[in-house]
Amino acid sequence: MPLASRLFLRHARALALAVLAACVWASWGGSRLEVDDQPTSIIRSDDAAFAQMEEVFEQFGSDDGTCLLLLEGSDPFTPAGAAGLRRVTDALTGLEGLVAGVTSLLDLRDPLGRPLVPEPEAGPERFAAARERARLHPLAADKLLGSDGTTNLVLAQLADETLPVAELRTRVRAIEAALEEPSSTQPWTVSLTGVPPLRVQIFDAIRREQVVLSLLAGLVGAAISFAVFRRLAPVLITSAASLVSAWWALGVMGAAGETINLLNAALPVLVLVIALTDGMHLMIAILRRREEGADPHRAGAHAIRSLGRACMLTSLTTAIGFASLAVSDIEVIRRFGLVFAGAVGLTFLAVVTVVPLLGSAFLKRAPSGSPALHGAGLARPFELLARAVVVRSRMVTAVGTLLTLGMAALSLQMVPDNRLTEAVPHDHGAARSLERMEAVFGGSVETSILVEYEDEQRGLDAMVAVHEALEREPFASGALSIVDVLRSLPGQGTPQAAALGLLPEALTRSLVRRDLRRALVRFRVPDEGAAVAEPGYARIQEALEGVEGEHPGVALHLTGTGFVARRNVNLIIEDFALGLWVAALTIVLVLAVAFRSLRLGLLSVVPNAFPLAVAGSVLTALDLELQVSSVLAFTVCLGIAVDDTIHLVSRYREERDRGRAPEEAAVRAVTAVGRALVITTLVLVGGWAMLLLSEVPTTQLFGLIGLVGLT
């Protein structure tokens, strides 16, 4: 890039002022950034299922705003158990403005209209009779009372169901504080679980670790860089360029009105990795030129002239490749692709300006030379390796291609998977409580069946059939609908539509909307992976189709957060994984055009695809799920592979333009670029390894795949 090099030589001060102005502007943009921690933002789509779920929430209320209190070792049908249950519910109802409603066994009535749970002063016979009635009560068994008889649930519905995590945290903490007194005075345990506390624990764990792990990764990477460069200035300069890249990217996101969500929150890490790679190449070129006697300013200009084109191609091809994600049907992926493409372009500008500018200011002392970096100690092994490969080029190409194809085929066996607790540390209270709840109640993830009917009685008859189908299905448990409410009334056998008029609308609004001729059948499913969940939902869907056929005028639809979120997150993973392969192929085409050689473009397929194939095959071999964190790690692998490939091919073309034979050009390219590749890889691997120390399973998976792809 001769023009950019001359611009740097003649107008370095103006360039520095422009960089400072861009940083100020990025600070303004970054100050406008907001975090979108709404649970439905990442699963939002334009399809009918999501629109139907939102409509159901508007009509019946959300299904993910309920805290579940698991009371274990407490028989509510004893004087002590009944008194303890009442203390728990009283503590929750006292949280006015935070908790909208509390549901427990205390709200149920027996056929005579008496409380199902007697007062603590009642005699043993009364409690024994109540225990037997509860076992058969349609609103108690497997819904509020566990199969063991000593575990029961209390449901605390939060006021204002759709809340950001900050507000959720306040309410969860208030519930925990309110439960301290009734929990401490009882021999049984009270634990809090459900979607709100799980969400709070996930965000808190990730936020806490972001600071600690980022600091550790930075320190390890800096230590490795210092060991290689043997000087502090090159380490600080390359680190500063990477940080400025992330800074600018966040600034543009804020200025454009983009919000931080669970997907694009990883963008700063991806930008840092790409910036560090290019920054290392530039720094090594500058130091090498300084050892040859050039002053810092001219050394920086030479680095821009010799490597600027390769850095630009790296950014251009990566940006075009990820911009191809804009064709996705899922909004969050479309936006991620466009934002990432823009961020990569800014990364190029930051690296090719910040590294030379800081080098001019802080590399004035003549380098003493690092044998590991500049001498023959590291160059000789690369030369020997390159010559060995060149001699056996056909065999190496064939073996590499076959390995890539084989591992890619193995990677295709991966299936997308997601669970409610996949990002929750296994030893955290809410996750452990959820596991115990599933063992006793059969499930924890709420799903719903929307029942649309023309005639009320036909609708009730269809709901009875749905209940019978769910009772036969091992994947479902705890089905609840207006049918159960009607069955709990005195003298009710087969639910009759006429009895609906006896029920207060305020108590049944979450189950039936007579004005809309709609009702819900709510049930729970276990928080299992795709191997269990997908067949389970398929069997339920098949059963619903059978019920529809037997009840004309009735339509049944699976809905709810548990069902729609699983499906849409899986679609995100599938679309993202496919988009990465499309991006890889797009990058190949761009390279072919940039180097004016279809052959070089095709030759870059294997080195670009190899890290993805290796990481995918390792994931398959370890029987690990393909999650959102997995595809983000694949993004890192692709970005690094493209960067390394372009720098190597660019140097090869440069050697060929000097008249060297293909074999000699390849050897010299590997010898010259290989050192930078090794140094960059060592720094990234050292920092990335710190992610394995995380207590968050998805972060550990992200770190594992990144390490495999980088090495």
Segments from the language model and where they lie:
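Membrane-embedded transmembrane helical bundles of large multi-pass transporters/channels
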Residues: 1-37, 41, 55, 160-166, ...
